[in-house]
Amino acid sequence: MENSVSSAALNAAREQLDAAEAAREVILLQHIANGVIIDSRTVQIAPDVVIAPGAVILAGTILRGRTVIGAGCIIGPNTLIEDSIVDEGSTVNASQVYSSHIGPHNNIGPFTHVRVNTVTDYGVHLGAYVETKNSNFARGNTVSHLTYIGDSDVGKYCNFGCGTVTCNYDGKDKFRTTIGDYCFIGCNTNLVAPVKVGDGAYTAAGSTITKDVPAQALGIARERQTNLDGWAEPKMEAYIAKKQKLEKEQSK
């Protein structure tokens, strides 16, 4: 197939790209001269971004809008931050942050999606495959992996087990979840908003919490386990026979 783009159009596009690259490099050099450590030309920084001296910006990082990065932060690699504040000493690794405020000495990522109006206090950890939105986290919270927290207010030093979900939307309206200080949210807990978990309360793994959990209480909402003796035996015999046949075929 013939290339329908004229030489003039290609030259104009090349000039535009070269100009954009030159402007981007000027911004990088200005930040480096101001004491920011930038280790790769793959970094993109918008003109209105403010970065304190001593921050480290790693390869593949994109800083957009009116983002502010504090001293001693390590941003990247492969991180996108837009219209957000990241306070001093925080790390944001391979994650995306939009219109939010990350507090000091936070550890964000990898693969964390911090959506609009997320606010974190000192020492918060949002780990792998965690998504937050319109939520406030007091100091010292740990949300390590595979969790969604939306429209929530979380007290200090809470721990969220893997698979926690705040069920904040009923198809029409959004509702808030309130979690007190020093709470322990067990793995695969569903918190059906509006709901409150009191200070120092626990939720048992696998629970769907639809009512408030009082302070210092254990909220548990799941069926009791029943074991049916011998139920698996005929299934297991057929399964083992199938695998033994496969082994013989593979050994030929």
Which residues fall in each region the model found?
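Acidic, glycine-rich loop-and-beta core segments that form the ion-binding/anion-interacting portion
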Residues: V43-A46, V50-L126
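Intrinsic disorder/low-complexity segments
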Residues: M1-N3, I81, G155
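General secondary-structure edge motif
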Residues: Q30-H31, V36-I38, P53-G54, A71, ...
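Glycine-rich hexapeptide-repeat left-handed beta-helix
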Residues: A9, V92-K252
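Terminal amphipathic alpha-helical/low-complexity segments used for targeting or macromolecular assembly
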Residues: M1-T42, A46-V49, G54, A215-K252
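Generic structural motif recognizing short loop/turn segments at the entrances and edges of beta-strands
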Residues: N34-G35, D39-R41, L80, Q96, ...
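Short amphipathic alpha-helical surface micro-motifs
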Residues: D18-E21, E25-L28, D39-S40, I45-A46, ...
